[in-house]
């Protein structure tokens, strides 16, 4: 059964015989909707006691969270198939990955994103694209519900292709966050949105389009014909988002609880021959020959070994103090203990502007906040 309601093609969960219909919660829903369908041997569908023919306008009240029981039938064969229409107030994304999905190796994928608000590429209701998809997050791979990252591509040339999904930035790379450990399904997104409102990049007058973290929206996800749950579709925090300079900009990501990530000292001298060093990853640049950990190493050494006099004389040159103060207040308000060494970005807007590189600090992975630890244990008040 292929089912369309008022021009919106429903997404099918074949495992549970369910049809997902996204509606715009901010719009007034019509009193009547046009029901269109097709399928082998399907002559009518039945909602309640009413038989409906394809193309018929019917009175149907649609509200988010509704589960409407339906039956699909044939006029000559006495056989009825039960199914459900599920109304959701968020967009629906459908992924089809016929070759499977792996870690750190993008596999072919087809994507369909249906947004009743038509925010994609400014007006598109149903966006379809070819893509490469992979699992995302090393620790999260052990969970049943996995996160994904995907890159939009041209099917014929396999070249990367930009799109403006859900009205977010125009880009090729996107994240689907599973929020597996967060029962509220909101911590990461709400905290990022708070940081967006909380903090202003010191160079924002020069770069008015710079954004200090991600933006995203909830979506219902169907993977290979089976409902997979609620996700957050978001853009990425990277050089492009922060508007760091291509020549002179640097972005480092703290991923472990090393002394280096905690700015407590250097146990192993840096090397630019790899993307990773002592729990840090060079997010930008990420090509050997362009990677430079010297600036980060100098910052760690400054924090760990500078005298009081040296620190007082140089800290305003080395750090965007406003950013650091905002970060200190932010992580304490949220009880973000998992963001005090790892899950932190350190960035440089342009190393060529000042005698000493000036660092900004940005949070990442904020699901261990607001009364929960990184592994979902409730904090004592």
Regions found by a protein language model. Give the residues of each.
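Predominantly extracytoplasmic/ectodomain segments of secreted and cell-surface proteins
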Residues: 1-63, 76-83
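Surface-exposed patches in mature extracellular/periplasmic domains of secreted proteins
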Residues: 201-219, 311-315
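Conserved structural position at the C-terminal beta-strand
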Residues: 70-72
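A conserved alpha-helical element in kinase catalytic cores
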Residues: 182-204
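Active-site acidic catalytic loop and adjacent metal/ATP-binding pocket
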Residues: 150, 317-373
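Extracellular Ig-like/FN3 beta-sandwich strand-entry sites
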Residues: 63-67, 106
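Internal "kinase-insert"/substrate-recognition segments embedded within catalytic cores
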Residues: 154-158, 164, 168-181, 212, ...
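Conserved NTP-binding catalytic cores of kinases and kinase-like/nucleotidyltransferase enzymes
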Residues: 25-28, 34, 38-39, 76-190
């Amino acid at each position: 059964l292929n089912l369309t309601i008022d021009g919106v093609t429903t997404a099918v969960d074949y495992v549970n015989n369910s049809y997902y219909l996204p509606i715009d919660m901010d719009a007034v829903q019509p009193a009547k909707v046009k029901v269109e369908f097709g399928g082998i041997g399907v002559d009518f569908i039945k909602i309640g006691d009413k038989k409906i023919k394809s193309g018929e306008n019917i009175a149907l009240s649609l509200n988010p969270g509704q589960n409407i029981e339906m039956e699909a039938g044939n006029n000559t064969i006495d056989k009825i198939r039960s199914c459900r229409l599920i109304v959701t107030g968020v967009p629906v994304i459908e992924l089809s990955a016929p070759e499977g999905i792996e870690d750190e190796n993008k596999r072919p994928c087809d994507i369909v994103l249906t947004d009743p608000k038509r925010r994609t590429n400014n007006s598109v209701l149903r966006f379809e694209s070819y893509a490469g998809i992979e699992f995302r997050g090393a620790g999260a791979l052990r969970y049943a519900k996995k996160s994904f990252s995907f890159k939009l591509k041209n099917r014929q040339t396999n070249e990367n292709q930009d799109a403006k999904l859900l009205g977010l930035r125009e880009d090729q790379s996107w994240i689907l966050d599973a929020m597996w450990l967060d029962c509220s399904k909101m911590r990461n997104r709400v905290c990022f949105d708070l940081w967006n409102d909380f903090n202003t990049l010191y160079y924002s007058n020069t770069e008015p389009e710079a954004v200090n973290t991600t933006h995203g929206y909830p979506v219902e996800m169907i993977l290979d014909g089976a409902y997979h749950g609620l996700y957050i579709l978001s853009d990425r925090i990277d050089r492009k988002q922060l508007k760091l300079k291509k020549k002179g900009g640097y972005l480092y990501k703290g991923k472990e609880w090393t002394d280096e990530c905690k700015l407590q000292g250097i146990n192993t001298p840096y090397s630019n021959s790899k993307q990773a060093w002592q729990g840090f990853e060079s997010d930008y640049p990420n090509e050997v020959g362009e990677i430079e950990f010297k600036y980060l190493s100098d910052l760690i050494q400054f924090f760990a070994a500078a005298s009081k006099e040296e620190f007082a004389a140089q800290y305003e040159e080395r750090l965007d103090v406003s950013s650091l103060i905002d970060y200190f207040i932010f992580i304490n308000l949220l009880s973000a203990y998992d963001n005090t060494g790892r899950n932190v970005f350190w960035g440089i807007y342009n190393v060529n502007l000042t005698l000493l590189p000036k660092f900004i600090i940005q949070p990442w992975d904020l699901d261990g906040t607001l009364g929960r630890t990184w592994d979902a244990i409730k904090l004592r008040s």
